[in-house]
């Protein structure tokens, strides 16, 4: 299965991926809102 190192790497990667996804979503929504005005 997984050892502690693999689990830590996966958790770290998942956290970074979610953070980037939220930032990208925020920038896209902000751009759409500004273009609407």
Swiss-Prot record:
One Pfam entry name: Ost4
Bilayer topology term: Single-pass type III membrane protein
Acyltransferase found in the keyword field: no
Lumenal compartment segments: 1-8
UniProt keyword terms in alphabetical order: Endoplasmic reticulum, Membrane, Signal-anchor, Transmembrane, Transmembrane helix
GO cellular component term, pick one: endoplasmic reticulum membrane
Protein's job: Subunit of the oligosaccharyl transferase (OST) complex that catalyzes the initial transfer of a defined glycan (Glc(3)Man(9)GlcNAc(2) in eukaryotes) from the lipid carrier dolichol-pyrophosphate to an asparagine residue within an Asn-X-Ser/Thr consensus motif in nascent polypeptide chains, the first step in protein N-glycosylation. N-glycosylation occurs cotranslationally and the complex associates with the Sec61 complex at the channel-forming translocon complex that mediates protein translocation across the endoplasmic reticulum (ER). All subunits are required for a maximal enzyme activity.
Recorded family membership: Belongs to the OST4 family.
Subunit structure: Component of the oligosaccharyltransferase (OST) complex.
Protein name in the entry: Dolichyl-diphosphooligosaccharide--protein glycosyltransferase subunit 4B
Native source organism of the sequence: Oryza sativa subsp. japonica
Source taxonomy: Eukaryota, Viridiplantae, Streptophyta, Embryophyta, Tracheophyta
């Amino acid at each position: 299965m997984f050892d502690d190192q693999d689990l830590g790497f996966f958790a770290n990667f998942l956290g970074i991926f979610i953070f980037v996804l939220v930032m990208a979503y925020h920038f896209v929504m902000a751009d759409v809102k500004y273009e609407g005005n």
